[in-house]
A protein has these predicted regions:
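Predominantly extracellular beta-rich ligand-binding scaffolds that present long acidic/polar faces
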Residues: 103, 122, 402, 406-505, ...
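Short, solvent-exposed linear motifs at loop/edge-of-secondary-structure regions
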Residues: 164-177, 217, 221-223, 257-269, ...
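Right-handed parallel beta-helix
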Residues: 101, 179-208, 212, 217-221, 225-228, 259-270, 285-296, 308-321, ...
Length: 619
């Protein structure tokens, strides 16, 4: 971006407006059928992240991890453990140890720095910071489990369990069912090697329970709202349309959960800590990370493990230690309704990795320089990686690409809305695609995006359905292949259902150089949209206050005057923050979200009628 544009955006950031100029949004019903979507407005913490003002303890540089842990343990509910400005050299990790309703807050990521030279055991995994519940609860040994005998329809909030002993109102319930043993020819949940997964092991090791030798990767995390006998009211309602008695549906839950814990306003340096995870949320609910600068994590910077309605926002992630496989930014390993919003990812190999998550929103993030040890290979900004992912929304992001791989199995009902995916990074020439949906990635919705790079991409779609099977690395779309770069692999054939169930509408691409409003790209069973009007958002009811005066929406075929050659793209706030924030001598941002974004009430949401412990498995 040119200097004048940078200066303009700098001035915009300094004088952000508090008003909203959003126009009323048309219903998403006009484009995406109700069977293919959910109400994403409920992702994250209902209302907003708590703004706590009472301090229970103030610690200064020189404090040890043990002293920080003691302060957290002694902190009354709803208060803050404050780490004043300076550097804390910690030879062990920080452990919330089952404590709920506490905020760990620094003076700002440019003022308070935690340097880890050790870590903490977090129910069998290692982390720099562990936010966990009080009792071990994982797929190999749930505290409580039962059968689920009735109430399977999409959207229902009433289910019947075999037993409710040990269950109480407010419990976090995990619903699951057996994977499909054969291809259904439609919605397909599978992690079996050669049938749907290319992992070289006999099982792909996607997360989830295994009962009687059958994996259970489809899950949804719900809260218990009421109990009457064995009839249970849940919130939210069921997301997927394929819950059914033939798959032996069941439920499991912990005795406790970590609730409303937050980590704010600090830098975390994981470089020499030896932890697998940076911040690990385990059996957590309504927790958050906000305004954190996270440096050089190992497996991941933030690990959302058996976690629901947790928020990661206004945060800067830099680097991974190995730049290989298992080098992630935010990893949503198992969970529902999490919100990953307005973050910056720089030199992170795989910035957002989706395990078997449902109802999660990944919104308005900026991704740059996906550093990988194979210099010419482009890893993608967002990757759906494990079997059982379904009904997740990816909106307003600016990065290089979106991928649903088949390393660990199948995926269903991803919605990709108003993103810019360039399909390219400097120096990359392999896997340079904007959208990759591999075999058994079905029922995706791709709407209102700007895709590809002018002068580089030459093929619209590489698939058997299109009849074009050349130049795979210069294609906007790569659809249905079981192997990389338009090949078959792992003993698995091409999957024609990826293309035939795909919904595309209003996407601008740099091959045809126009937006595609093509009724032939609307699949059977979904009505062709009546017009070309797109909603501004699928989860926000209007422009959020932290957006300021910048154009809203920022991306789409209906956007004009933007910064890219098509005029259809403006920088989102995370990209603007990246562009204008000074860097140190290593190219790392001198980051503080409070200097970039207006602090304000939460974004308005759409309303809808939808409703020696054994180690946990690795992938």
């Amino acid at each position: 971006m040119r200097r004048k544009t940078l200066l303009l955006f700098s001035l915009i950031l300094l004088c952000l407006s508090t008003d909203s100029d959003a126009q009323p949004n048309p219903s998403p019903r006009e484009i995406i059928g109700v069977d293919r979507r959910i109400d994403w407005s409920q992702a994250g913490i209902p209302g907003s992240i708590p703004n706590r003002t009472a301090f229970c303890a103030t610690l200064n540089p020189g404090a040890t991890a043990a002293q920080i842990n003691s302060a957290i343990a002694a902190c009354p509910s709803g208060q803050v453990v404050f780490l004043s400005a300076g550097t804390y050299n910690l030879s062990a990790g920080i452990d919330f140890a089952g404590k709920s309703n506490v905020t760990l807050r620094g003076a700002g990521p440019d003022l308070t720095t935690l340097v880890f030279t050790g870590n903490v055991n977090c129910w069998g995994q290692s982390a720099s910071i562990c936010v966990r519940n009080a009792d071990l609860h994982w797929i190999g040994g749930p505290a409580h489990s039962t059968t689920w005998t009735a109430g399977y329809a999409k959207g229902t909030t009433q289910i019947t369990l075999g037993s409710t002993a040990g269950l109480s109102v407010g419990s976090l319930l995990i619903l699951d069912q057996d994977n499909d043993t054969t291809d259904t020819g439609g919605v397909y949940v599978c992690d079996t090697n050669t049938a749907c997964a290319t992992d070289t092991s006999s099982s792909s090791s996607s997360p989830g329970r295994n009962l009687n030798g059958v994996d259970r990767n489809q899950q949804q995390f719900v809260q218990v709202a009421a109990i009457k006998g064995t009839r249970v009211t849940i919130s939210p309602g069921l997301y997927m349309p394929n819950w059914r008695s033939s798959q032996n549906p069941g439920a499991w839950w912990a005795r406790t959960k970590a609730t409303l814990d937050g980590i704010e306003n600090m830098t975390l340096d994981h470089t020499t800590g030896g932890a697998k995870g940076g911040i690990l949320f385990l059996n957590a609910y309504k927790c958050w990370v906000k305004n954190v600068k996270s440096l050089k994590a190992n497996r991941n910077h933030v690990w959302l493990y058996q976690t629901a309605r947790t928020v990661v926002r206004d945060t800067y992630f830099y680097g991974t230690q190995n730049a290989l496989a298992l080098s992630y930014g935010v990893e949503s390993f198992m969970g529902s309704d999490n919100l990953i919003e307005n973050n910056i990812f720089q030199r992170v190999t795989a910035p957002v990795l989706m395990g078997n998550s449902s109802g999660t929103v990944v919104g308005y993030n900026f991704f740059t320089d996906h550093y990988y040890n194979v210099a010419s290979w482009m890893t993608t900004s967002i990757d759906a990686h494990d079997a059982g992912t379904g009904m997740n929304l990816f909106e307003g992001n600016e990065g290089n690409g979106f991928l649903e791989d088949n390393i660990h199995g199948s995926h269903n009902f991803a919605t990709v809305f108003r993103n810019q995916f360039t399909g390219l990074e400097p120096g990359k020439r392999l896997q340079t695609n904007a959208i990759i949906l591999m075999a058994h990635s079905r029922y995706a919705n791709i709407v209102g995006n700007v895709l590809g790079t002018s002068g580089y991409h030459t093929v619209y779609e590489h698939s058997q359905a299109s009849g074009h099977t050349g130049s795979p690395d210069k294609s906007i779309y790569l659809l249905g292949w079981s192997g990389v770069q338009g090949k078959t692999a792992g003993g698995m054939p091409y999957d024609p259902l990826v293309a035939s169930t795909l919904l595309r509408w209003g996407n601008f691409d740099y091959v045809t150089k126009q937006a595609q409003w093509n009724s032939a790209e609307i699949p059977a069973g979904n009505a062709v949209p009546a017009d070309r009007t797109l909603p501004s958002s699928l989860y926000l009811s209007s422009k959020p206050k932290w957006w300021g005066t910048m154009p809203w929406p920022a991306i789409g075929p209906d956007v004009t005057g933007g910064q890219d050659p098509s005029g259809h793209v403006y920088a989102n706030p995370a990209q603007v923050c990246y562009n204008v924030t000074p860097k140190d001598s290593h190219g790392i941002l001198i980051f503080n979200a409070d200097r970039c974004y207006q602090q304000s009430p939460p974004a308005p949401r759409r309303t809808s009628g939808f409703n020696d412990l054994p180690l946990m498995p690795d992938t």
